[in-house]
Amino acid sequence: TTKAYRAHEQEQVILRRAYTLDAVLRGMSIYIDPEALLVGNQASADRAAPIFPEYAMDWVINELDQFDQRDGDRFTITEENKQVLRDIYPYWKGRTLQDKGYAAFPQRARLFYDLGIIKTEGNITSGDAHIAVDYGRVLREGLKGYRARTLEAQEKLDLTDFQDLKKSYFYQAILIVLDAVEAYALRFAELAQAQAASATPERAKELLEIARICRKVPMEPAETFHEALQSVWFLHVILQIESNGHSLSYGRLDQYCFPYYERSRQAGMTEEQACELLENL
């Protein structure tokens, strides 16, 4: 994240965030658990969590040596990773969302904050939250549908108009992110394909199916229940990677996934197989 922000300091904020997500999705550690049927990870291991320095860093540095001693939400962090965080801290000082939010406080609000009358940490240090995106539309159209609509909208812009110029940054960011999402999914397709070569016959069959699905969704419309759940999970985990995973919901998973469940059941999927996929989710 820090490398990407440094590399794109001259860009508009929305483009810096798009390039950062692109760098993360292409470069982060990925893995497939031994019996997993759905793939996609937010951190480098199960029960781990990434740090989002662009939102806030003061509290991270202040609590760095107490993470493993807290009453709740304990984390163990290596000395090496502690040093990495201390090394990037000077860059983020004054640049985080929290810093910019505090700078925008009216004088009276700042006084109330300093006195402890108001608290802002849950909102001022987080991305978009308490939302459920339109997973159903992605399942129906695939992200290639979003790409096509974005390119069409770009063609209609008049870049001599200031409002259209602002829109152009948004559309550029969409295209960067869509390419990044596709690259992320394809990384899992390649990993599953590679693992299949040394797996048991039964597991190899599962891994090859994972590879096939990851080459398809979320860019293409889903057709099966397995494809639908994998597409939803890719979108859900990437949203958490992009905006620190604060209060994101699946919404009505039962409604938008039911057509794919019904189709797969008619094609021979058993109730036990469907249940196993949901347990993976």
Model-identified regions with their sequence ranges:
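Long, non-catalytic protein-protein interaction scaffolds
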Residues: 1-156
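Structured, charged N-terminal subsegments at the starts of enzyme catalytic cores
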Residues: 145-281
